[in-house]
């Protein structure tokens, strides 16, 4: 079965993103395909490379990156939601004359078209 996830909660402060990551792990362990994860609203904060959790805390931002690096799961970030919340890649930062960029490697700024494509091509879409 082919899955896609939508994450609307931040990396820290709510349970949504960590539950989504655990669900993603279970999907893959059961032999299913995880096509992509689409981060929307506050969920875009999962792509902020400037997070620095304590050494005894789970680093969810880097865990998402590992999911991409090790399993090839596409990590889409809604570009409009990201820019509103101060998450941007190098290209957008230059285009908008911002001083810096902070998009964690492995994540891609995308439009809602990526979410629509996932809805059309996956058997299940689960929102967290």
From Swiss-Prot:
One GO-annotated biological process of the protein: tRNA wobble position uridine thiolation
Top-level EC class as recorded in UniProt: transferase
Any Pfam family the entry gives: DsrE
Any GO molecular function: sulfur carrier activity
The EC number(s) this enzyme carries: 2.8.1.-
Function: Part of a sulfur-relay system required for 2-thiolation of 5-methylaminomethyl-2-thiouridine (mnm(5)s(2)U) at tRNA wobble positions. Accepts sulfur from TusA and transfers it in turn to TusE.
Stored PANTHER family: PROTEIN YCHN, SULFURTRANSFERASE TUSD
Family: Belongs to the DsrE/TusD family.
Subunit structure: Heterohexamer, formed by a dimer of trimers. The hexameric TusBCD complex contains 2 copies each of TusB, TusC and TusD. The TusBCD complex interacts with TusE.
Protein name: Sulfurtransferase TusD
Source organism (scientific name): Klebsiella pneumoniae (strain 342)
Name of the encoding gene: tusD
């Amino acid at each position: 079965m082919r899955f896609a996830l939508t994450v609307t909660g931040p990396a820290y402060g709510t349970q949504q993103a960590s539950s989504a990551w655990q669900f993603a792990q279970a999907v893959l362990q059961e032999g299913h395909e995880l096509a992509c994860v689409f981060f929307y609203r506050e969920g875009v904060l999962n792509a902020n490379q400037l997070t620095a959790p304590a050494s005894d805390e789970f680093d969810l931002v880097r865990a998402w990156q590992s999911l991409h690096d090790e399993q090839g799961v596409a990590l889409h970030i809604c570009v409009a939601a990201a820019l509103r919340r101060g998450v941007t890649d190098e290209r957008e930062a230059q285009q908008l004359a911002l001083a810096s960029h902070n998009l964690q490697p492995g994540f891609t700024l995308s439009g809602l078209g990526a979410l629509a494509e996932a809805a059309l091509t996956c058997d299940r879409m689960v929102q967290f």
